[in-house]
C-alpha cells in the first residue's frame, strides 16, 4: 500500500516550495485591510508587523525600498490598507505577506475609488484638451460656487475687489462637504448655466483632507462641470490637492485666490497700461507732429527754392558760369592749338626735305662719278684681258693651224681622226680646211712606215 503512493510523497522542502509557488501564482497581488500590531524596525530599515482583525492575524514584512514611499509612521492599533504579495517563508513554513504600499484604511479606500473614477472618466475622454473652453478675456461677470461661510469665498472676493472692484460677482452658495454637497454643487452649476448671468465660473473650496475634498471627486460633479456651457475654473484646496474636478474643468487654479487672479483684470495694472499707452500715444503724436513739421519746413524750402525768380536767378548764374567756362575753354583750346602749331612748325622745320634733297643729290653725283670711274676702269681691264685672251686663243686655235696648211678630219660620228685604224676603206669622213669642209670616201688605208 505504501509503495503505491511513494510517487505522491513530498519532502518538507518540496512541500514548502510547492505551497509558495501556489500562493504566489494563484493569489498574486491583493489589498488587505487590518490593524497593525507588533510593529518593529530593525537596523536594516525593514518593517515587520502583524495585520489582524477580530478573528485572525497574519505576519507581514515591508522592505526598506518600499516603506520609504509611505508618508506616515505606522502606529500600533492603526487601521491600514496594504497592497501586498502573498508568499511562504520556506525555511520555517510560515506564510506571510510582503507589503508593497500602505495607506490609512479610510483614505486608502477613497484613493482606490478616486483612481477607478479617474480611469473611467479619462477613458470616456472627459479630460481631453479638445473639450477645454477658453476663458473670456476680459470677464464681464464672475460666478462663484462655494460655501458662503468658507475661507475660499473670502479669499476670492478679497482678490477680486483688490484687482477689479467694478467686476460683477454672483455667488451660488452650496455645501462643499458632506453627503448633500455633490448634489448642491451640481444644481448650482446647472442654475448658473440656466440663468446665463456669468461668463466664467469658479468652483472650489479651501484645503482639507481627502475625505473633506471628496465632494469634488464625485462623478456627478465631474459630469456637471464637463456639461457646463460656461467655462469653469476649478479651485479646490491647496496646490498639492488634485481632484477629479481639476481634470474635468477648463482650467485648474492651485488655490481659490489664484482662481480669482486668473479670471479678473488687475485694474491698477490696467491703469498703468492705460497710462503707458497714453504716454506712448503722446510720444507718437509728438514724433508725428515733429516729423510733419520737418516735412512742412522741407517742402516750404523746396517751394521757395523753386520760385520762378529764384529759378531764373539760378539759371542766369548758371548761364554766366557756363559762359565763363566756355570762354576759358575757348582760350585754352586756342592756346593749345597755337602750342600745337608751334610744335608742328618746329618739327616741320626740323624735317624740311630740301636740305636732305641737296645732300642726296650731292651723294648721287659722288656715287655717279665713282660708278663711271669704276666702269671705265673695269672696261679697260676687260679690254686688256680680252686682248690677251684673243692672242692666246689665236695661238692655240685650230683655225690658225688650218691657215698654215693643216686640216682636221672627223668620222661621221664627229670623232677626230688621229690614227688610220679609226677608218676603213669605204668610210666617209669630213675634212675641215681653212675656208670650209670636204666630204670624202676612203679608198684604201695604208699604214705608215
Swiss-Prot record:
<dbReference type="GO" id="GO:0005737">
    <property type="term" value="C:cytoplasm"/>
</dbReference>
<dbReference type="InterPro" id="IPR003753">
    <property type="entry name" value="Exonuc_VII_L"/>
</dbReference>
<dbReference type="GO" id="GO:0008855">
    <property type="term" value="F:exodeoxyribonuclease VII activity"/>
</dbReference>
<dbReference type="GO" id="GO:0006308">
    <property type="term" value="P:DNA catabolic process"/>
</dbReference>
<comment type="subunit">
    <text>Heterooligomer composed of large and small subunits.</text>
</comment>
<comment type="function">
    <text>Bidirectionally degrades single-stranded DNA into large acid-insoluble oligonucleotides, which are then degraded further into small acid-soluble oligonucleotides.</text>
</comment>
<keyword id="KW-0378">Hydrolase</keyword>
<dbReference type="Pfam" id="PF02601">
    <property type="entry name" value="Exonuc_VII_L"/>
</dbReference>
<dbReference type="GO" id="GO:0009318">
    <property type="term" value="C:exodeoxyribonuclease VII complex"/>
</dbReference>
<keyword id="KW-0963">Cytoplasm</keyword>
<keyword id="KW-0540">Nuclease</keyword>
<comment type="similarity">
    <text>Belongs to the XseA family.</text>
</comment>
<dbReference type="InterPro" id="IPR025824">
    <property type="entry name" value="OB-fold_nuc-bd_dom"/>
</dbReference>
<dbReference type="InterPro" id="IPR020579">
    <property type="entry name" value="Exonuc_VII_lsu_C"/>
</dbReference>
<protein>
    <recommendedName>
        <fullName>Exodeoxyribonuclease 7 large subunit</fullName>
        <ecNumber>3.1.11.6</ecNumber>
    </recommendedName>
</protein>
<dbReference type="Pfam" id="PF13742">
    <property type="entry name" value="tRNA_anti_2"/>
</dbReference>
<dbReference type="GO" id="GO:0003676">
    <property type="term" value="F:nucleic acid binding"/>
</dbReference>
<keyword id="KW-0269">Exonuclease</keyword>
